[in-house]
């Protein structure tokens, strides 16, 4: 069960940075303005993209094939993300994200249902708009701090990972006004530090987010997003390279945002996996409420 818990945990890893799009891609806030958002996330999964070849249905299942969890397993995650960005200048923003997780995993080998809940790992961000023409280009850096409770217990999906991350992201954005269209592209590299408690380096990651949006009238925004993550293998006990912990996932996320007036908007999304490796498969539902505040 230890190995099973490891690959389930990686679902939670992406949740810490995935289900919400931090403020407006490459755009930065005007000086003195505050942008806030609270997002609810829910996922129930009984399938995953396998991490290693398996034998099933009379044949070998290749890495990345979508298969049911062993022993009728089912993973459920509920999360709430609170985040805020503040414009220090017209070009420089700082941001904060605080997640709350409630996660559990059950299968036919257990009489109980192991679960964990609580505040997860907090993230801090800074964004600097380098240029504005002919398109926006922004550099974003971030860190994930091990503030969540990491539990190395059989069957538990912990809310914290017990290690630091450092993100480096380049973002390009373009408005196509007078057409009511915009596009964003972000590509980042995540340096993942060792979890000293279990002597495990989870492996660095590349990640990306591509997004296009169109305004329908003055209040409705339709969006289409592609998101992905690719990781290196983990290194266990100082020198053992564990390729079964390589992670891959690609999401398609159609979403809509409805302006409620006064700088407030409601966003709804359905995030679906297209392919992966060592990752939960299926759909994720999100609902977010954002608000902006002037000086």
Model-found features: residue ranges?
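Outer membrane beta-barrel transmembrane domains
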Residues: 49, 57-67, 202, 207, ...
